[in-house]
Amino acid sequence: MNLSEIWLREYLSINLDLNEIINRITKIGLEVEKIIPVSMKFSGIKIGKVISCKQHPKCKKLKIFLIKINNKNIINVISDYDKSLINKKIAVAVNGSILPNRTIVEKKFLYGYESCGIFCTYDQLKIFGLKETSKDIIVLDKNAIIGEDIKNYFFLNDNIICIKVSHNRCDCLNIIGLSRAISSEYNELLENKLINKINSTKDYGFKIKINEPEACPKYLTRKIKYINLNVNTPIWISERIRRSGFKPKNIIIDIINYVFIETGQTIKIFDADKISGNITVRFSKEKESMMISKNKKIIIQKNTLVVSDKNSIIEIAGILLGYSARIDSKTTINIIISSVLYRSKFLFGNSVKYCINSDLAYRNERNMIDPNIQHLAINRATELILRFCCGSPGKIINYINNKFLPKKILIKLYKKKLYEILGFFISKKLIENILLLLGYKYEFIKNYWKVSVPSWRMCNVKIEEDLISDISRFYGFEKIPIDLSYKKIKYNNCKYNINTLNNAKKLLTNRGYQEIISYTFVDKNIQNIIHPNKIPVPIINPISTEMSVLRLSFFTNFIQTILYNQNRQTKYIKIFESGFCFSKNKKYKLGIKQSFFISGAVSGFKNVESWYSKQREIDFFDIKGDVETLLYLNGNSSDFEFKTCKNKEFHPGKNSKIFFKKKYVGIIGEINPNIQNKLDIKNRIFVFELLWDNIKNFYVPKIYNISDIPFNYRDISIVISNKIPIIEVIKICKDSIKKELININIFDIYQGKEIKKGHKSISIRLTLQNKNYNMTNLEINSILEKCICNLKKNFLIEIRTIC
């Protein structure tokens, strides 16, 4: 946001130097990016009037101009400009003037004739933002005073303050809001300098009809008749809006932009004579269209919020004005001005849908408008229109539906929580004074304040922590004590049943992973490709369209990171991240469930190609080994199970859900090839996701004495269906043998001509031991028979060999 220093000072009741203003803006929480002087240093440039022009007797290219500087001083200026300058007022550097490049203008003789000055161009004077054709001579309007210093005419003793406004301080996106915030820092309340009510009872006989009160709870409008648009915009208005980044066009557009910068509320103006019947706010129907220029129209999608008259759509609400009711400076004499409050959820996405990139659309879509500013804005616009364009105003026609207006925000601010977060003591009286200066109203009840949020902060103050942030910022971060030794610190008792997150991170790092930190906000379109059946949590006030929803998982971040690195020739990538992911769930507060995950992704080739080894692409079992090692930190790895599942996000045959004691704890698999093709991913990507809260408990393993009794080994080869997971076979073996089973290992899997179709041969090695005595062959065979019997009963296996 850019704004004029002079304009800002009009609203400040205290006299501050520029550095102090910058410091206060920074303290508010905004960033002053730079200060741009409106012009470079120069002096002696005057406004002069061209009286006459004649050809130079000795040079065909030059002309001699007679310039009136004041009533007593008329000078000659020799230049190559033409006679079109006669009777026009221009900027002249007279004898002794100093230009921005430090050149001193002196009298010169050109072919025997004296020239006492030069005509100035915008480029010569280095005036910021004035005119695209900066090499043109500065020609001024008829009202310019002859002999006046050009600095005074253009208000050049000014600076442009360039501010980066954070998304949680949208109340500072206008002159009034920023002035209010600065004034509060000096224990001053902002004086309302725009109390200019236009008291009119004239009824010009037009009505508004709101079909969708939920989408448009407030609509204020008035008709102004007999205005004159054939007037030039006053230089102070055009220069102020120009310094704020708006290009001056005509008196009406300039006034609208001026009020927008001043109040933050947009004003819509229609040609009253081009509107048929009532103004109606409604949702569009199928196959409706709107003219946006004389020869161009756009198709309006169904259920878009629009403003229409009897015949056609005249505006896409809060986004784009149509052509049919647009004002014309040559023909318009009656206008309708409107100041409207729309609810952002009914507008969000329309700017992208209709390719409109404007500050107005951005603010309307993100609930960045003060719901109580509409009256002030429409009266301010009316005042300026009447002041410069004359006219006869009608009464304001109000439509206000209190049911759908933003509800008053009441927040409980507890003293205990305030002091716990701040870490130091602030007196109750000072806290209450800070709240008042920031515009909050409060009531103290027992141990908390019941705080009412002002309308201009409703877009960004929602919870107790927002109030604490405001109080600490106002109090001054520089005043926070360095020594916090008196702060009460809670120590958690160290328990052995906690598997720390740091241990997990260290393990993954030791296995070659790199930790990344990514935004919680992700691209909605990419996330929809990865999670097509899940509804993400939208951001009301997103940083950009690429960061418009909360992440459902880390997979979106991983894929974008891997793509970025693959495009830069990184062949081997192993990354992980831990943090919260979010999903919609009505059972939780605010309807949002947040879960803490530790997740990872691998892609590329396992090793570098060399004379002793070939390059191998990472496969499912590589990442499964990493996950199993991570799960071993739990101390009870035997209770984890990997079960294949059907999931559109993963490759159909290369994924597993992970369970711990039959409770879901995570998932692992290869990203679906269809998703990889859509996102133009070169190498296969394998990912895992673990619910940290479900695996962080550490189970101390039981310790046994090492027995002197030797082990017994038995191998069983069986044929089973491909549909039967091997984990189920292992589970049956464990349940059958129990105490005597020391270890079970699958050492061979075979499929070939000797094995019937749809089946596989599995070889299992059982390690058996009795802790107290040597087992006999009879006992061992009895155990094996029991195991085989249970396998046959559950899976209809065929025995190949037992040894």
UniProtKB/Swiss-Prot annotation:
The UniProt family comment states: Belongs to the phenylalanyl-tRNA synthetase beta subunit family. Type 1 subfamily.
GO biological process: one example = phenylalanyl-tRNA aminoacylation
Keywords on this record? Aminoacyl-tRNA synthetase, ATP-binding, Cytoplasm, Ligase, Magnesium, Metal-binding, Nucleotide-binding, Protein biosynthesis, RNA-binding, tRNA-binding
Q: Where in the cell is it found?
A: Cytoplasm
Q: Where is the FDX-ACB domain?
A: 707-800
Which InterPro entries does this UniProt record tie to the protein? aa-tRNA-synth_II/BPL/LPL (IPR045864), B3/B4_tRNA-bd (IPR005146), DNA-bd_dom_put_sf (IPR009061), Fdx_antiC-bd (IPR005121), Fdx_antiC-bd_sf (IPR036690), NA-bd_OB-fold (IPR012340), Phe-tRNA-ligase_IIc_bsu (IPR045060), Phe-tRNA-ligase_IIc_bsu_bact (IPR004532)
Quote the subunit structure annotation: Tetramer of two alpha and two beta subunits.
What is the name attached to this protein's record? Phenylalanine--tRNA ligase beta subunit
Does this entry carry the keyword Transmembrane?
Answer: no
MF-aspect GO terms: ATP binding; magnesium ion binding; phenylalanine-tRNA ligase activity; tRNA binding
Reactions catalysed, semicolon-separated, are: tRNA(Phe) + L-phenylalanine + ATP = L-phenylalanyl-tRNA(Phe) + AMP + diphosphate + H(+)
Specify the B5 domain's residue ranges.
406-482
tRNA-binding domain residues: 39-151
Q: Name one GO cellular component term.
A: phenylalanine-tRNA ligase complex
Record's keyword annotation contains Magnesium: yes
Which cofactors? Answer: Mg(2+)
Annotated signal sequence range: none
Q: What is its EC number?
A: 6.1.1.20
Enzyme class (EC, first level): ligase
Q: Where does Mg(2+) bind?
A: D466, D470
Q: Which SMART domains match?
A: B3_4, B5, FDX-ACB
How are cofactors bound according to the entry's free-text note?
A: Binds 2 magnesium ions per tetramer.
Q: Which PANTHER family does this entry report, sorted A to Z?
A: PHENYLALANINE--TRNA LIGASE BETA SUBUNIT, PHENYLALANYL-TRNA SYNTHETASE BETA CHAIN AND LEUCINE-RICH REPEAT-CONTAINING PROTEIN 47
